[in-house]
């Protein structure tokens, strides 16, 4: 009976500490050390939340950089996060990629892969610099801007690898589109 009491007591203490104490301590530390990130890295404009730096959004106008396609529900639905689960040889996936490539095609240049394929999460907020530079002529034409100005903006908005070795260079689509709106 003594072992049973010890086991039950240990279970209750563990549940309280791990189920309540630890999450509250971590939440408090996150709010204290990284308050912006702990609250979702929200981007606010004119007092209104317009998005998160961490969750992609759909941009479809010719004057905006387009995000990666999303397989997460209807657009960038965070509640339906996930890839398409279609194999690379699946005819439906091949057809989707071909349609996206045809829609993005500009001249003889090959469309960067991240403009025609969804990510594993379906919520990526970033594109590669190659995908951004690929879209630059369309954006410059739609906004009546010099191509050099759009290319300069891409260079300024490109984030390097973290610590010089983690990840790949990337461009946050929401951030660069907001900068475009400020330019024009």
UniProtKB/Swiss-Prot annotation:
GO CC field: plasma membrane
Domain of life: Bacteria
This protein's UniProt keywords: ATP-binding, Cell inner membrane, Cell membrane, Ion transport, Membrane, Nucleotide-binding, Potassium, Potassium transport, Transmembrane, Transmembrane helix, Transport
Membrane topology designation: Single-pass membrane protein
Protein localization: Cell inner membrane
UniProt KW ATP-binding keyword: yes
Membrane spanning stretches: 6-26
Record function comment: Part of the high-affinity ATP-driven potassium transport (or Kdp) system, which catalyzes the hydrolysis of ATP coupled with the electrogenic transport of potassium into the cytoplasm. This subunit acts as a catalytic chaperone that increases the ATP-binding affinity of the ATP-hydrolyzing subunit KdpB by the formation of a transient KdpB/KdpC/ATP ternary complex.
Entry-linked PANTHER family: POTASSIUM-TRANSPORTING ATPASE C CHAIN (PTHR30042), POTASSIUM-TRANSPORTING ATPASE KDPC SUBUNIT (PTHR30042:SF2)
Subunit structure: The system is composed of three essential subunits: KdpA, KdpB and KdpC.
Protein family membership: Belongs to the KdpC family.
Name of protein: Potassium-transporting ATPase KdpC subunit
Organism: Acidobacterium capsulatum (strain ATCC 51196 / DSM 11244 / BCRC 80197 / JCM 7670 / NBRC 15755 / NCIMB 13165 / 161)
Gene: kdpC
């Amino acid at each position: 009976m003594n072992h049973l009491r010890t086991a039950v007591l240990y279970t209750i203490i563990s549940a309280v500490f791990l189920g309540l104490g630890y999450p509250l301590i971590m939440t408090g530390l996150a709010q204290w050390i990284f308050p912006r990130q702990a609250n979702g890295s929200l981007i606010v404009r004119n007092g209104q939340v317009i998005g998160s730096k961490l969750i992609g959004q759909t941009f479809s106008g010719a004057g905006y950089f387009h995000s990666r396609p999303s397989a997460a529900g209807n657009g960038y639905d965070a509640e339906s996060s996930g890839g398409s689960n279609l194999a690379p040889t699946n005819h439906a996936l091949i057809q989707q990629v071909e349609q996206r490539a045809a829609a993005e095609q500009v001249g003889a240049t090959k469309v960067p892969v991240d403009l025609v394929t969804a990510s594993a999460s379906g919520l990526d907020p970033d594109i590669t610099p190659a995908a951004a530079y690929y879209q630059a002529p369309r954006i410059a034409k739609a906004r009546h801007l010099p191509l050099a100005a759009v290319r300069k903006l891409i260079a300024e908005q490109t984030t390097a690898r973290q610590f010089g070795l983690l990840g790949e260079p990337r461009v946050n689509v929401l951030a660069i589109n907001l900068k475009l709106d400020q330019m024009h």
